[in-house]
């Protein structure tokens, strides 16, 4: 899953271990097909991705101390965010993605780190079952939302396994609305009120960055309202360029229950929306 992050603030330092003397770093880095994330794996040594995990967690205000917390990392990719949570003291981390851990480089990184509290779960955000994976104090939902064909369903599913806070980061279209002619414009350049109206821009092919995995670009208000409609209380934490970070906790009104779909036992059973 893609995300681009510019630093906004510094996170308190966590304990980064020295590189084991018996580890072949060159072999490790070459064994991974694609390094997506940049993270200080050992003191002074960074994975060769371009997306800074440190900046992402800082912009999202993920606590430096996660002692005793149970964490779900949705769209984990290389696993760097999950392993950073382990470093910050989380008691258990479930790293979720669609591909195999070998394809993503997760297995190689886990072995190099000698991690014992992070486990990989191959699956989809659309099928989060608390009876299978439990519930979580912290859910990381970074660079995923705009890659989803069914974003509201995904947020409903996050609510099922949440007992704490969702930290979410996504593309937003407030500063990057794709206009006719494939030019990007500020949403407010069309009308100042549009940033206050929940909007989702649909990408039917690869209009955004030449990537067929991009489906919907929300504006900030749409993200807030989507979480609220799932029974979560959401807030904007930071915005930089065409990215924004949010936090959401349980406590809002579940408007899904008041809809025709929400009132349908068939729909709620088939989609497992029994929160």
Residue ranges and their predicted role:
Residues 2-41:
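N-terminal, positively charged/glycine-rich alpha-helical extensions of SAM-dependent methyltransferases
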Residues 17-33, 87, 117-119, 138-139, ...:
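N-terminal targeting leaders
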Residues 47-69:
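Conserved alpha-helix/loop element of class I SAM-dependent methyltransferases that forms part
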Residues 62-63, 127-134:
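Short amphipathic alpha-helix with an adjacent loop that forms part of the alpha/beta core around
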Residues 69-77:
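Conserved class I S-adenosyl-L-methionine
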Residues 80-127:
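Class I SAM-dependent methyltransferase SAM/SAH-binding core
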Residues 125-126, 136, 140-141, 149-275:
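S-adenosyl-L-methionine-dependent methyltransferase catalytic module, highlighting the catalytic core
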């Amino acid at each position: 899953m893609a995300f681009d992050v510019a630093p906004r603030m510094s996170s308190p330092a966590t304990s980064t271990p020295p590189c084991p003397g018996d580890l072949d770093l060159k072999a490790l880095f070459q064994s991974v097909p694609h390094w997506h994330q940049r993270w200080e794996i050992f003191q002074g040594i960074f994975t060769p991705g371009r997306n800074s995990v440190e900046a992402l967690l800082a912009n999202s205000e993920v606590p430096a101390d996660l002692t005793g917390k149970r964490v779900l990392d949705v769209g984990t990719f290389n696993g760097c965010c999950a392993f950073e949570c382990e470093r910050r003291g989380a008691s258990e981390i479930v790293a979720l993605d669609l591909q195999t851990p070998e394809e993503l480089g997760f297995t190689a990184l886990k072995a190099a780190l000698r991690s014992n509290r992070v486990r990989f779960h191959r699956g989809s955000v659309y099928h989060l079952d608390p009876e299978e994976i439990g519930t979580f104090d912290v859910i990381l939902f970074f660079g995923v939302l705009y890659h989803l064909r069914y974003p509201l369903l995904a947020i409903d599913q996050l609510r099922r396994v949440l007992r704490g806070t969702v930290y979410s980061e996504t593309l937003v279209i407030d500063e990057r609305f794709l206009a006719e002619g494939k030019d990007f414009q500020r949403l407010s350049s069309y009308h100042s009120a549009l940033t206050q109206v929940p909007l989702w821009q649909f990408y039917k092919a690869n209009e955004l960055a030449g990537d067929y995995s991009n489906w919907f670009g929300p504006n900030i208000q749409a993200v807030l309202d989507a979480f609220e409609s799932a029974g979560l209380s959401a807030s904007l934490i930071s915005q930089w360029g065409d990215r924004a970070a949010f936090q959401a906790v349980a406590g809002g009104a579940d408007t899904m229950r008041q809809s025709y779909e929400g009132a349908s036992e068939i729909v709620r059973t088939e989609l497992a929306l029994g929160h």
